Amino acid sequence: ILQLISLILLPQQKKSYYLMGTYSYIEMPSADLNKKAYKILHDIETKLSDYIDSSEVSRINANAGKNFLKVSSITMEMIKKAIEVSEKSFGYFDITIGALTINAKRLKKIDEFRAKELVNFKDILIKGDSVMLKRENMAIDPGGIGKGFAIEMCYKKLNSKKGFISIGGDMKIWGHKRTIAVRDPRNGTSLVQMVNSKDVSISTSGNYLRKHIETPEDDVLQVTVAHEDGGFADAYSTAIFAMPEKMRRKFIEDNPDVGVLIVYKDGSIFINKRFMEFFEILLFKTNSEKQRRKN
C-alpha cells in the first residue's frame, strides 16, 4: 500500500475524510478547493457505491435481467471504462464480479457456483444513456475501479493547478513533486521510496487489501500500477494481480502505457520501463533482496 513520506513545502490545505469505506486524504492549494474536492468525491460515491441502496449502481443491480436504468454521465463513464479494461485484460478484470462478491458472499442471495456463472462483462447492455445487466442476479461491483475513477473525475472537475488525493490504495499527484513509498506487504516497512517526475496516478492491489479480487495461486503478493489516469491505474492493478504469471507478463508487454511494480513472496520485485518513467528517483530498501527488473 502507498504511504505519504514528505512534500515540498507550499501553501496548502490538508484534511482527512472518510470516503468510500476507507480513509481519504485531500491536499489542495486552498480551503475552498479542498471542500470542493470532498463534495465532488462524495457526490460520486452516492452514485457508484454498492453499499448505498439509492445509488445508481445499486439500482442497476436491483433491476438486473428486468429493466434498463437511465444513469448519469459519471456512472456511464465508469462502466464504459470498466468494459474497456475487461477487454484489454482478457476478462481478468470484470466489474460484474458483483454477482459473487455482493449477491453470493455478502447478501447470500445465490450460491457461489451460480454466481460465478453470472460473471460476464459482455452481458452489460448499454442503450443510449441507460444500462441493464442481461441476467437476473448479476451485479456490478465498482470496488476494483471506483476509487481511482472517482479521484480522476475529481481531478478533472477541480481545475486546480496542483493537488494530492489519496483514497485507500489509490492516489493522484499533480502539479508538484512528492516523495512516496510502496510498503512491503510482508512487514509494513518501506520497500521502495520514489519521487515523481510528472503527474501520476498510482494504485496498489493485493488480496490483503481488496477482498473483491479472485486470485490465482502463485507467488505474487502485491501489484502497484502507475498510469496517467486514476481509473485505469485502479482497474489495471486489480486485473494484473488477478492474472496468472504468464498472462500477466503478456499483458504488460502488450500495454506499454501501464507502469507496473510487482512484489513477490520471496522479496524479489519486477519493475517495467514505464513505471520508472514516472519517477526521477527510486530508492530500494536494501541491496540484499533479489530484484527482478525489466527495462
Model-predicted regions and their roles:
Residues 7-295:
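Mature catalytic core of soluble alpha/beta enzymes
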Residues 1-6:
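Bacterial N-terminal signal peptides
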